[in-house]
Amino acid sequence: MPGHELEDVINQRLNLYDVLELPTPLDVHTIYDDLPQIKRKYRTLALKYHPDKHPDNPSIIHKFHLLSTATNILTNADVRPHYDRWLIEFLRKTNDIERNKLIQKLEESESSTIPTTTPHPDLLQIQRHGELLRKLKHFNLPYGDWKHLNTQDQENASQHPYYDCSTLRIVLDNFLQSNNKSNCLSHLRNQVFITLSANEIYDIYFSERNNYSKDDSIIIYTVFDTPITAQHVFRNWSSGNLIPTVKDISPLIPLHYYSDFNLETELNDDIARLVSNEPILLD
């Protein structure tokens, strides 16, 4: 019964989106509501974790049952809203507690005696990030994946003007030395996206959930040179131009985030005249 399943899931503090390897909603506006995709994910993972393939592995059998539970709840229109409300509130409280602990630790570190030697670069990075966290908390803004600081990724993001909207989440078959960045870049350029030029793939980074030695597939976030290139790759995939070694391609920022976007900005009068070729009167 879904009601009993929901109670058990909440008692165990389970994130069913993680179970199905789907994006976790951060608020009511970002709830993942693509039911066909949920069912496709279930079928793919159920084949991978089916007990018949792993009869002597209790953790795999448990994973298989969790997949069924997650699918039952996330595809049930009556039960899912209750679960989503609980999960969003639970994650908010958990993240607030963890973030406050980090902020407190940062404040204690910053208020301590200034050392005579130059601080370690990682400490400087954490201190700068702590300042950002406090600002985001003050203005009640979302703060993303603040637990994992990657200096190189942040530097790359700062150098690319459209880093996030040029990024696609690519699930592809695991391959030899897939955890090596240069090897992975070469694989993407020479084996996967062979119609693209080398400079159209700007950067890549890996999902922290990748298990390179055991999993059949891995997740690579691929940053293209422009949003137009990323859009071209995604549209090709969505229109049925499949790539044999690729299991899924999706935007880093889910499309439904923009489903109700209707912001209109009025042009400055001078710009409007330029667009319409009207003369600009000088004082």
Swiss-Prot record:
GO terms for cellular component: cytoplasm; Prp19 complex; spliceosomal complex; U2-type spliceosomal complex. It comes from the Eukaryota. Signal peptide: none annotated. It is found in: Cytoplasm; Nucleus. Residues 15-87 form the J domain. SUPFAM superfamilies: Chaperone J-domain (SSF46565). Keywords: Chaperone, Cytoplasm, mRNA processing, mRNA splicing, Nucleus, Spliceosome. Disulfide bonds: none annotated. One of its GO terms (biological process) is mRNA splicing, via spliceosome. Belongs to the DnaJ family. Involved in pre-mRNA splicing. May be involved in endoplasmic reticulum-associated protein degradation (ERAD) and required for growth at low and high temperatures. PANTHER family: DNAJ HOMOLOG SUBFAMILY C MEMBER 17. Belongs to the CWC complex (or CEF1-associated complex), a spliceosome sub-complex reminiscent of a late-stage spliceosome composed of the U2, U5 and U6 snRNAs and at least BUD13, BUD31, BRR2, CDC40, CEF1, CLF1, CUS1, CWC2, CWC15, CWC21, CWC22, CWC23, CWC24, CWC25, CWC27, ECM2, HSH155, IST3, ISY1, LEA1, MSL1, NTC20, PRP8, PRP9, PRP11, PRP19, PRP21, PRP22, PRP45, PRP46, SLU7, SMB1, SMD1, SMD2, SMD3, SMX2, SMX3, SNT309, SNU114, SPP2, SYF1, SYF2, RSE1 and YJU2. This is Pre-mRNA-splicing factor CWC23. It comes from Saccharomyces cerevisiae (strain ATCC 204508 / S288c). The lineage of its organism: Eukaryota, Fungi, Dikarya, Ascomycota, Saccharomycotina.
